[in-house]
Amino acid sequence: MTESFQKLEKIGEGTYGVVYKARERNTNRVVALKKIRLENENEGIPATTIREILLLKNLKHSTIVELSDVIYNNNKMYLVFEYVELDLRRYLDRMSDEGRLVEEGFVRKMSQQLLTAMEYCHSRNIFHRDLKPQNILVDPKENIKLADFGLGRAAGIPLRTYTTEVVTLWYRPPELLLGCKYYDASVDVWSAACIMAEVVLMRPFFPGDSEIDQLFRIFKVLGTPNNSRWSNVENFPNYKVEFPVWDPVDLKTIFRGDPDFVDLISKMLEYDPKMRMTAKNGLSHKYFEGMPLIME
């Protein structure tokens, strides 16, 4: 590894391993070098993981961080990504420190780019499963790019990050919190809506500190679900008949800006994944009227 890349600094410990800012020696290009943590490094990497990760090299879109190379030696796997300095978490923290709110134009542009990246991957049957502000990168022109798409299925999502930090629950959809084992692209749509809400509110929408706290925070806003609202939910492994019953809150009282934005995220936060708006349908929502589609 050291022959090809000079590690400049450690920039993070993500869900899947350590990330370094590095320089490619023969081109001088600055890249993000992600060392994938493997459950048992002695056994080597399963062929399925290698296949899945190689598929990610085919994802080429302006809204997705490009995976330019996969390096595998001594049972270690490194992924070489284009380097983008800022992520949405740090972008929002910086705005907050400066006492500034995010402009409406940024919210619309970011939401459209986020849904475009999702639609591009979902149409190829690749899901993210771990969308959060930390893996949405913001370039100097305030365009966003999604990182870590597809790694969830390729590497498996651990319960803890590389250190012992627990993977955040704030963007996790209710079907996963309720123990549903089968899920699809709609999990990403829920996470995206939570992120869009956070950008507008300048604070996490559902900042739970445990799975039950996470569920109850969702229920307090959207109402406690039951079979009449979400078919079969009462049979999910973690559903309890003793759940407190909350009525839904009108989202317009939380988001006082553009009513089209409220309509869009309410459709993305539909409890029943089958009824939840898809990324593709989201892109043709009235909220994006007049905005040109983003081509590859």
UniProtKB/Swiss-Prot annotation:
Residues 5-288 form the Protein kinase domain. Its EC number is 2.7.11.22. It catalyses: L-seryl-[protein] + ATP = O-phospho-L-seryl-[protein] + ADP + H(+); L-threonyl-[protein] + ATP = O-phospho-L-threonyl-[protein] + ADP + H(+). One of its GO terms (biological process) is signal transduction. One of its GO terms (cellular component) is nucleus. It is found in: Nucleus. One of its GO terms (molecular function) is cyclin-dependent protein serine/threonine kinase activity. The keyword Protein biosynthesis does not apply. Its main location: nucleus. The keyword Cell membrane does not apply. SMART domains: S_TKc (SM00220). ATP binds at I11, G12, E13, G14, T15, Y16, G17, V18, V19, K34. PANTHER family: CELL DIVISION PROTEIN KINASE (PTHR24056), CYCLIN-DEPENDENT KINASE 2 (PTHR24056:SF254). Belongs to the protein kinase superfamily. CMGC Ser/Thr protein kinase family. CDC2/CDKX subfamily. This is Cyclin-dependent kinase 1. It comes from Encephalitozoon cuniculi (strain GB-M1). The gene is CDC28.
